[in-house]
């Protein structure tokens, strides 16, 4: 007799049921919190009658199997693929199945995709009743089992600052099936020794995590060191099971519900400038029904030199009123939910992973959704002929010089932020008032989401 030991478990995911190879099947490096199983439903029939000696027996019938359940954790391990020279993670199939209903296309721009700078995940193509299906193969010692037609229900990044960056995955499948034969050679499909040694330098230290949180209405950025947090992506999957008399039924399929990208943050309550107390006061003071914050968690920190990091971005989040946590050191807890620009936009947020992020590429990722796409870092406002004075009723064309010149989106919005002697339109044409004089401050704000601004003062004179 032999027993199966959990420590000898290996997990594989595949997009196919036959013809397994390294392009359609992937080994997942999991921790010891792995679990899987499938329970059932039954009906008890009892009788209830009067009299001194009633019938008290009962019968039980098996009705159906619930959807098979599974969950496990993986470390976040971005590395450079030796074959493509692009950034990748060992569990990229999971990220794709979480985010898209199409076949995997790492060369694309939605779901899971990559380039030489970073591996990215967005949710712009997740409006499907059925997301990309995976089949999970479980090898424990020499015993194989298989969970058929799985959808990933949830992925949660738990930012425990004493831990290593990891993701907890969970979901369901139609049925858990023991296999009599080996479906493929695990040593041929599994992660090779060279790749395993490569990713040893990719572990991410949560202790270095940075929170970037900015009020999008006031452009006010807060500086809050966190003590913990979560970042959760949920597809709200439900399974459909028939109900046939005299037969045990199994689930026949699954469907997505509302997509949710939510999170929570904890921090000590401090009174420093732009700290957690100031955020608390600002939210209490305004009491907005709807607010808008850009939230980014930078796991692994940001540096001028290249370091492994994971960036979790809620591009437009609604932040709940924080709660006060009473402990030896007073703290605060903040809950948030990412909101799309339109209900069908799929732009709630995105994630980026790289073994070589820098301060610049992290900013690019937060602004553009891709660390390889340059964001605006500075704006110089200019005027035609470089003039600084303008006669009443005259016009002056304003323009900008954007840094870096390689920035993808160089468009700006124009505004007058001080003075009333002139107005400016959407194209940057400044028009002096016919009767007023004085200085006006012309401001240009980058449209790429970076929030970068530039200003120039023009003085309106009576002329001569």
From Swiss-Prot:
Q: Identify the stretch annotated as signal peptide in this record.
A: none
Q: Coiled-coil ranges per the record?
A: none
| Span list, region Disordered | 40-59
Q: Where in the cell is it found?
A: Virion
Stretches assigned to the BIG2 domain: 375-453
Instruction: Tell me the keywords, alphabetical order.
Output: Late protein, Viral genome ejection through host cell envelope, Viral long flexible tail ejection system, Viral penetration into host cytoplasm, Viral tail protein, Viral tail tube protein, Virion, Virus entry into host cell
Q: How does it assemble?
A: Homotrimer. The tail tube is made of 40 stacked trimeric rings. Interacts with baseplate tube protein p140.
Please quote what the entry notes about the protein's domains: The C-terminus possesses an Ig-like fold of the Big-2 family.
Q: What is the name attached to this protein's record?
A: Tail tube protein pb6
């Amino acid at each position: 007799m032999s027993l199966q030991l959990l420590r000898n478990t290996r997990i594989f995911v595949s997009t196919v049921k036959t013809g397994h190879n390294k392009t359609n099947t992937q080994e997942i490096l999991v921790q010891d919190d792995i679990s899987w199983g499938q329970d059932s439903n039954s009906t008890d029939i009892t009788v209830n009658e009067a009299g001194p000696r009633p019938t008290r027996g009962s019968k039980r019938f098996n009705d159906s199997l619930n959807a098979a359940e599974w969950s496990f954790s993986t470390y976040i391990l971005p590395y450079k693929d030796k074959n493509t020279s692009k950034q990748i993670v060992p569990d990229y199939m999971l990220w794709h199945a979480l985010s898209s209903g199409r076949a995997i296309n790492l060369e694309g721009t939605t779901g899971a995709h990559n380039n030489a700078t970073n591996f990215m995940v967005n949710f712009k193509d997740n409006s499907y009743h059925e997301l990309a299906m995976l089949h999970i193969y479980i090898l424990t010692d020499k015993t194989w089992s298989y969970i058929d037609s799985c959808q990933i229900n949830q992925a949660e990044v738990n930012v425990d600052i004493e831990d290593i960056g990891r993701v907890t995955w969970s979901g369901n499948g139609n049925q858990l099936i023991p296999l009599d034969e080996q479906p493929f050679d695990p040593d041929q499909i599994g992660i090779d020794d060279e790749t395993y040694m490569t990713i040893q330098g990719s572990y991410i230290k949560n202790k270095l995590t940075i929170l970037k949180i900015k009020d999008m209405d006031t452009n006010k950025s807060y500086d809050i060191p966190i003590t913990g947090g979560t970042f959760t992506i949920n597809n709200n999957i439900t399974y459909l099971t028939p109900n046939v008399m005299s037969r045990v039924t199994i689930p026949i399929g699954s469907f997505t519900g509302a997509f949710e990208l939510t999170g929570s943050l904890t921090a000590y309550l401090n009174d420093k400038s732009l700290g957690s107390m100031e955020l608390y006061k600002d939210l209490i003071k305004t009491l907005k029904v709807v607010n808008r914050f850009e939230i980014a968690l930078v796991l692994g920190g940001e540096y001028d030199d290249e370091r492994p990091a994971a960036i979790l971005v809620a591009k437009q989040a609604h932040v709940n009123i924080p709660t006060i946590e009473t402990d030896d050191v007073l703290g605060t807890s903040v809950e948030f939910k990412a909101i799309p620009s339109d209900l069908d936009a799929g732009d709630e947020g995105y994630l980026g992973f790289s073994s070589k992020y820098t301060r610049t590429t992290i900013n690019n990722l937060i602004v553009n959704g891709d660390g390889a796409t340059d964001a605006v870092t500075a704006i110089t406002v200019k005027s035609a002929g470089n003039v600084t004075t303008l006669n009443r009723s005259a016009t002056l064309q304003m323009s900008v010089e954007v840094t870096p010149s390689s920035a993808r989106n160089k468009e700006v919005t124009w505004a007058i932020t001080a003075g009333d002697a002139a107005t400016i339109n959407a194209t940057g044409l400044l028009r002096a008032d016919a009767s007023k004089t004085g200085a006006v401050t012309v401001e240009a704000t980058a449209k790429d989401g970076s929030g970068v601004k530039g200003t120039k003062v023009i003085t309106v004179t009576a002329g001569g």
